[in-house]
């Protein structure tokens, strides 16, 4: 599975002009399932998202995770948005290929799984809608943008 994490002051996703999900300070996670991904890769990716220390501590060092923004246990928001284009292969010309992305039904199943697990593990989770034409608005913090990739076990 692939994710691009962006540390944000705020973010929201709109579908057909309506806000589908929004957060204050926290992480915007663009997520893509690849062929061969399973719940195991989704679990590893989510664990990394929640534990990655990319928020500043009192000394200004990246020492806090989205689960502990202020050092006192206050959690930030997690906005999860599906984006199959993260699996783009741009090596064969000027038109990207998306054959590395999971088939739509499998991608949706794994997206729903990671959202369900995130809601079980984190108090503030918002989402877009799989397959929808979405507009994502964010106020990037830093900016801090981190790519994450968990290879399918079959590819190891």
Swiss-Prot record:
Please list the GO terms describing molecular function: D-tyrosyl-tRNA(Tyr) deacylase activity; Gly-tRNA(Ala) deacylase activity; Ser(Gly)-tRNA(Ala) hydrolase activity; tRNA binding
What Enzyme Commission number(s) apply to this enzyme? 3.1.1.96
Q: Which Gene3D superfamilies match?
A: D-tyrosyl-tRNA(Tyr) deacylase
Q: Which GO terms describe its biological process?
A: D-amino acid catabolic process
Enzymatic reactions? glycyl-tRNA(Ala) + H2O = tRNA(Ala) + glycine + H(+); a D-aminoacyl-tRNA + H2O = a tRNA + a D-alpha-amino acid + H(+)
First-tier enzyme category under EC: hydrolase
Location of this chain's protein in the cell: Cytoplasm
Please tell me which stretches of this chain the record labels as motif Gly-cisPro motif, important for rejection of L-amino acids: 142-143
Its function? An aminoacyl-tRNA editing enzyme that deacylates mischarged D-aminoacyl-tRNAs. Also deacylates mischarged glycyl-tRNA(Ala), protecting cells against glycine mischarging by AlaRS. Acts via tRNA-based rather than protein-based catalysis; rejects L-amino acids rather than detecting D-amino acids in the active site. By recycling D-aminoacyl-tRNA to D-amino acids and free tRNA molecules, this enzyme counteracts the toxicity associated with the formation of D-aminoacyl-tRNA entities in vivo and helps enforce protein L-homochirality.
* Entry's family note: Belongs to the DTD family.
Q: How is this protein named in the record?
A: D-aminoacyl-tRNA deacylase
Q: Which organism is it from?
A: Delftia acidovorans (strain DSM 14801 / SPH-1)
Q: Which gene underlies this protein?
A: dtd
